Amino acid sequence: MFEIIPIKGGVNAPQGFYADGVSAGLKPPLPNGAPALDVAFLYSEDVLKPFTLFTSNRFQAAPITHFKHFIKGKESNFVLINTKNANAMTGERGVQDVCDILSSLTQKFPFIQNPIMSSTGVIGQYLPKEKIIASFASFDFNAKCENAHTRAADAIRTTDAFSKEIALRVRLDNGESFCIGAMAKGAGMIQPALATMLCFITTDALVPQNEGDRILRECAKTSFNAISVDGDMSTNDSVFLFANGRSGVYNEAAFKEALKMIMHKLATDMVRDGEGSTKLVAFEVCGARDESQAICAAKALTNSLLVKTAIYGEDPNWGRIASTIGASGVECNEESLRIAFDSVVVFDRGQICFDEENEARAAAVMEQESFRITCDLGIGEGHFVAYGCDLGYRYIDINADYRS
């Protein structure tokens, strides 16, 4: 058995890691005139091989290409993150820009080994190399400021309304413990198959090198690969897990449960922070022929514009839900389908349960900031939960002006 305890510190909570955020002038100043944080770093006192997940978009951004060609399989102790510019669709020049920036970094700080770069922002623009390189003068690895992790989480934001970070301590029955910390960004271009996001996870658990990638993939299946804001897949999606083993402690079940909690929290925060969203909705599909069909139906619901706009209008239009399931290609029929808003059943095995009272109850459910729509296909044992949000006017406002 084990106990999982929330703690402070974000990615800096585990032993041997330090992250901070600085301003490179990539973002405009804040309303009060102060410079906005737009470059972050994550430094590990130990060199290690990170466990990774990347976007399945065929047009992968230059930082991902650089990692796969120059860093993969090597030990690293540093990640440099910039916002405002994705360095995607920039070809060979984009990769060379990454090489130039990281070369300047290692010249200034010789203790940095095989640094990794991660970018997020507008696609199709070249990096402002000089500004990013100039920001290195603000890097302080000795300050160990208590709020540095918060600055780092703030610096990686793009259209995010709030920073996303979390830290947990896992205590085993024998009294031994380890920590996991994380920070992430993501609010738009969120689509299953990672989502448009960056996530950096640190731990002092002694994770075996041959287990980390598998566990990361398994935890992503029900978190980052189970969310959607707008159905668009980014070129830059990346998840990094750094494990230095300093605690000397590891228990697979405990580690996996804590990592799953962290990734689920960050993933649902992304949906909750979806550009212009006001609702977080869990779309639970059960009774499908198998898990793959449950996944297909659940993700179809998260991406349906008609379903999303009905949620925004707090309209329990269950017909849109049924139609989306029917169009998803999964095995289903009216006689076995059951649809409920939380505990309010509106359609049950071919019977419409949508009288005036039930409609009012379902509408009341939809007034909440977070609720569940359950669709039981009544065919098999397949089950999956995907997370989505509504779609309102604010999403259009944000994305119509995104480059400005």
Swiss-Prot record:
Its EC number is 2.3.1.35, 2.3.1.1. One of its GO terms (biological process) is L-arginine biosynthetic process. The record marks T120, G121 as: Involved in the stabilization of negative charge on the oxyanion by the formation of the oxyanion hole. It catalyses: N(2)-acetyl-L-ornithine + L-glutamate = N-acetyl-L-glutamate + L-ornithine; L-glutamate + acetyl-CoA = N-acetyl-L-glutamate + CoA + H(+). The record marks A195, T196 as: Cleavage. The keyword Protein transport does not apply. Keywords: Acyltransferase, Amino-acid biosynthesis, Arginine biosynthesis, Autocatalytic cleavage, Cytoplasm, Multifunctional enzyme, Transferase. SUPFAM superfamilies: DmpA/ArgJ-like. It is an enzyme of class 2 (transferase). Substrate binds at T158, K185, T196, E275, N399, S404. One of its GO terms (molecular function) is glutamate N-acetyltransferase activity. Pathway: Amino-acid biosynthesis; L-arginine biosynthesis; L-ornithine and N-acetyl-L-glutamate from L-glutamate and N(2)-acetyl-L-ornithine (cyclic): step 1/1; Amino-acid biosynthesis; L-arginine biosynthesis; N(2)-acetyl-L-ornithine from L-glutamate: step 1/4. GO terms for cellular component: cytoplasm. The active site is at T196 (nucleophile). It is found in: Cytoplasm. Heterotetramer of two alpha and two beta chains. Catalyzes two activities which are involved in the cyclic version of arginine biosynthesis: the synthesis of N-acetylglutamate from glutamate and acetyl-CoA as the acetyl donor, and of ornithine by transacetylation between N(2)-acetylornithine and glutamate. Belongs to the ArgJ family. HAMAP family: ArgJ. This is Arginine biosynthesis bifunctional protein ArgJ.
